[in-house]
């Protein structure tokens, strides 16, 4: 387990040099907070990983935060084929802007969103 506020270093070479090292907090019971470091700032928004036999990511953060979230998931041992579900609570860009990038990085994951938001995720225009 990771102690709260531990900073986890970059997991692999797949993340470019501009991606900040993920900040991961162990919330207990296999739940982790991942600071998305929105716009390069810590403490604004977070994603949550619920580990288990079918890991679930709640919220993706912005598209610019997606590499940080992917790096954090890798540091937590979640590979491209491990993530089962991505849940977005609503489709504001700070919560769901990274869905496309996360879905690409984790092609096996099912994206779950309210039916009213689904069409906007597919076509935000």
Q: Which stretches of residues belong to each language-model region?
A:
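Active-site HxH/HxHxD metal-binding segment of metal-dependent hydrolases
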Residues: 43, 64-67, 74-125
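Short, positively charged and aromatic/hydrophobic N-terminal segments
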Residues: 10-11
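Conserved beta-strand hairpin/beta-sheet module of binuclear metal-dependent hydrolase folds
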Residues: 18-76
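Metallo-beta-lactamase
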Residues: 14-29, 117-125
């Amino acid at each position: 387990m990771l102690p709260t506020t531990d900073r986890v270093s970059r997991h692999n070479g797949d993340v470019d040099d501009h991606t900040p090292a993920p900040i991961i907090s162990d919330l207990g019971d296999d739940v982790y907070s991942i600071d998305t470091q929105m716009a390069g700032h810590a403490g604004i928004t977070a994603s949550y990983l619920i580990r288990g036999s079918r890991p679930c990511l709640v919220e993706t953060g912005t598209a610019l935060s997606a590499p940080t979230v992917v790096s954090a998931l890798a540091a937590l041992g979640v590979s491209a084929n491990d993530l089962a579900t991505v849940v977005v609570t609503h489709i504001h860009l700070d919560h769901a802007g990274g869905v496309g990038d996360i879905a690409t990085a984790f092609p096996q994951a099912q994206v779950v969103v309210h039916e009213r938001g689904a069409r906007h995720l597919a076509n935000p225009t």
